[in-house]
Regions:
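N-terminal amphipathic/basic-hydrophobic helices that include classical n-h-c signal peptides
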Residues: 1-20
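Detector for intrinsically disordered, low-structure N-terminal pre-sequences
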Residues: 18, 22, 149-150
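Residue-level detector of bioactive/disordered segments in secreted/extracellular proteins
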Residues: 9-11, 33, 127
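Intrinsically disordered, low-complexity N-terminal regions enriched in serine/proline/glycine
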Residues: 6-8, 25, 84
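Local sequence-structure signature of Cys/Sec-based thiol-disulfide redox active-site neighborhoods
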Residues: 20-44, 48-53
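A short alpha-helix capping/helix-coil boundary motif
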Residues: 15-19, 42-44, 60-62, 79-80
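Thiol/selenol-based redox catalytic cores and closely related redox-interacting motifs
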Residues: 53-157
Length: 157
């Protein structure tokens, strides 16, 4: 049996050498914003876990967890353009969060993207430079988006 102090020592040792949480991106390769965010993550020195959410949608529980971590209303995660949003009548303010989640589970294209998860937080990264707020190393230098816009972020502490 280990003593209390041995547990404290082991716990402290593990904290010192803790492996950082990997960066995860819920990605749609057909989306320019999502491609820009992925490129910014890589330029920061991270190789993220890439979840192509249209091929591998999050579970309902995971989606609820992401929404809670972003501290946004469910409705704010809905994508309108290029989706069945209008046909499904999702602009109806009477629809509950559960009904909106049902729609996103049935039609993952309704989930706005990209969502990025890091040890510093979870964000819907629109515009793409929003990702810099949660990257472990946001000092990526000058970055040129696909549309030619140059982003010159400063390191944030």
């Amino acid at each position: 049996r280990r003593s209390f102090f041995q547990y404290i020592y082991i716990s402290s040792f593990m904290d010192i050498f803790e492996v950082p949480m990997p960066v995860t991106i819920y990605h749609n390769p057909a989306c320019g914003t999502s491609r820009n965010v992925l490129a910014m993550i890589r330029q920061s020195g991270e190789e993220p876990e890439i979840i192509e959410y249209l091929k591998t949608p999050p579970t309902r529980e995971k989606l609820q967890e992401l929404i809670a971590a972003m501290a946004i209303p469910v409705r704010d995660l809905l994508r309108r353009k290029g989706t069945p949003y209008d046909e499904l009548g999702l602009d109806d303010p009477a629809l509950s969060d559960a009904e909106l989640l049902d729609a996103m589970m049935a039609h993952p294209i309704l989930i706005n993207r990209p969502i990025v998860v890091t040890e510093k937080g979870v964000k819907l990264c629109r515009p793409s430079e929003t990702v810099l707020e949660i990257l472990p190393n946001p000092a990526i230098g000058a970055f040129t988006k696909e549309d030619g816009e140059v982003v010159s972020p400063q390191a944030k502490k």
